[in-house]
Amino acid sequence: AKIVLDRFHIIQHLSRAMMTTRIDIMKTFDTRSLPYRSMKNHWRILQKDSRKLSLNRFFSRTFGQTITPREVVQKTLNFSEELKFYYELYQILLFHFQEMNSKYFFELLEDNLDLVNPAFKTVFKT
């Protein structure tokens, strides 16, 4: 039997790996800490394609100020180098996949296979 993945399922697999990774990193912080609350409350922004983030400001109860989604991402990524690595990898993979740059997409998968956690390894091997 041959398994065929379509575009939707590849992106779904990638975003689940990113979500699992975010949750694992989030669990290393105290539940009342700002990093934990930021990762928990703004998870949708972290999952979103960075090119599609809005420039509109909104009041973030987590940070207690008016802020743009891009600023939320920057502040949240500053809490964890590991999260920053996976976020940037996720965004680059999304970009190459959506732009149909299969050469760069598969090169990224091969280059980072040994550097990633089990959730991303599963995606890369599929």
PLM ranges: what are they?
Residues 1-2, 8-15, 31-126:
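Acidic/histidine-rich catalytic cores and adjacent linkers
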Residues 15-27:
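Short, surface-exposed amphipathic charged segments that create phosphate/polyanion-binding patches used
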